[in-house]
């Protein structure tokens, strides 16, 4: 009977796989972004499945147990849908489109593997030589890559739309940076490049051996390893969520002639100050519209047309002016005044203050002729 060999190639892939599964277990325990983290965990599990045929192949599993052939460890047609579902779920509360159909290709691949796995050895050998390797293997590889490319394009466009939504609809845009999602998508782009190089080599030179494809698997393992660490270390708070209606890009309605948008924006500003709503660091346009008993479209027009600003800058301008009043009134601690006026951190306050006033808080205090005991 063939002996198993745990060489360095197997051990390296095993080490990566174990770490990915440990990271997945920690992600499942997180209380925030549970739905998105579930998709990320599944993505890491599918990645481990992708490495498994190589990992056990180098160890001699297929030589010792030929019946393992066609076992559906690698389910690459799930990769693209999981990337899209993760990006969507970080930024939205509803299910990623197109619903259950999103998972159909992956389950087709799984079903095919399960059916072939239980066939006898002679049937497997004939099918592999005449059908699977000439046709289906190429379809699986190219289909998985195409699905991943489509998912990345859709996710990147959605990411850009989300960044624009943050600026227009959330006062937390200055302190909340969705860079983790951007980094995740860039990593997926690098993964696509690695897989694409492998597929191009197969087209140019014919089928590649386990040894020839091993560097691509190591590159993929490194990418997923970095992603797992990034998810554990960087993604520490929930993303502000886009409401369902914001995905539609319908044409705006015509504006009523003669409406005093500037006056309405001024009234809105006074109402926000009177209610102290600007003191809430995570105030959003949908929440403010609800409190005003109006709709978000009308509120956005009031801010955009009346104040000439997006929602984020409109609220932060009110906060900066509140800090300036605190300092003019004798407040000595700049940071304490900033936190009392709706800012969540010193870094965010310094950045927003400089952006709106054109100077740092320290320079502003100096212009007022007062020493700055605390600030930037």
Where are these regions (language model features)?
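Hydrophobic transmembrane alpha-helical segments in integral membrane proteins
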Residues: 1-19, 142-145
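Hydrophobic alpha-helical transmembrane segments of multi-pass membrane proteins
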Residues: 13-23, 39-58, 79, 112, ...
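Membrane-interface helix-boundary motifs at transmembrane edges
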Residues: 27-39, 89-100, 164-177, 209-210
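Helix-loop junctions on the outward
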Residues: 49-72, 121-128, 201-207
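Alpha-helical transmembrane segments
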Residues: 66-67, 134-151, 218-221
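The cytoplasmic-loop to transmembrane-helix boundary for the fourth helix
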Residues: 91-118, 132-144, 171-188
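Interfacial "cap-and-anchor" motif at the non-cytosolic start of specific transmembrane alpha-helices
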Residues: 189-243
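Membrane-proximal linker segments that couple transmembrane helices to downstream signaling/catalytic modules
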Residues: 232-336, 340, 348, 352-355, ...
């Amino acid at each position: 009977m063939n002996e198993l060999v745990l060489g360095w190639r197997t051990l390296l892939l095993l080490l990566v796989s174990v770490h990915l599964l440990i990271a997945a277990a920690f992600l499942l325990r997180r209380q925030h972004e549970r739905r998105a983290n579930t998709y990320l965990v599944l993505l890491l599990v599918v990645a481990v499945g992708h490495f498994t045929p190589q990992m056990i192949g180098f160890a001699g599993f297929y030589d010792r147990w030929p019946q393992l052939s066609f076992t559906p460890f690698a389910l690459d047609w799930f990769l693209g849908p999981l990337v899209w579902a993760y990006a969507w779920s970080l930024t939205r509360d509803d299910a990623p489109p197109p619903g259950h159909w999103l998972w159909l290709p992956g389950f087709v691949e799984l079903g095919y593997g399960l059916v072939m796995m239980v066939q006898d050895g002679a049937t497997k050998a004939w099918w592999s030589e005449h059908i699977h390797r000439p046709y289906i293997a190429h379809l699986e590889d190219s289909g998985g890559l195409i699905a991943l490319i489509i998912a990345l394009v859709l996710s990147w466009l959605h990411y850009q739309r989300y960044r624009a939504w943050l600026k227009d609809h959330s006062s937390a845009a200055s302190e909340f940076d969705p860079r983790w999602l951007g980094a995740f998508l860039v990593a997926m782009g690098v993964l696509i490049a690695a897989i694409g190089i492998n597929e191009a080599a197969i087209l140019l030179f014919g089928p590649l051996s386990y040894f020839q494809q091993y560097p691509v698997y190591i590159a993929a393992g490194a990418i997923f390893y970095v992603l797992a660490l990034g998810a554990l270390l960087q993604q520490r708070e929930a993303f502000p969520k886009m409401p369902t209606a914001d995905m539609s890009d319908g044409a705006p309605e015509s504006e009523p002639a003669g409406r005093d948008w500037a006056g309405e924006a001024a009234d809105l500003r006074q109402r926000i100050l009177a209610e102290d709503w600007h003191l809430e660091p995570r105030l959003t346009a949908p929440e403010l519209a609800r409190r005003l008993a109006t709709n978000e479209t009308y509120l956005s027009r009031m801010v955009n047309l009346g104040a000439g600003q997006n929602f984020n800058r409109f609220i932060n301008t009110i906060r900066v002016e509140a800090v300036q009043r605190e300092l003019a009134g004798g407040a000595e601690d700049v940071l304490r005044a900033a936190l009392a006026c709706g800012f969540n951190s010193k870094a965010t306050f310094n950045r927003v203050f400089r952006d709106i006033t054109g100077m740092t808080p320290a320079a502003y205090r100096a212009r007022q002729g007062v020493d700055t005991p605390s600030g930037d």
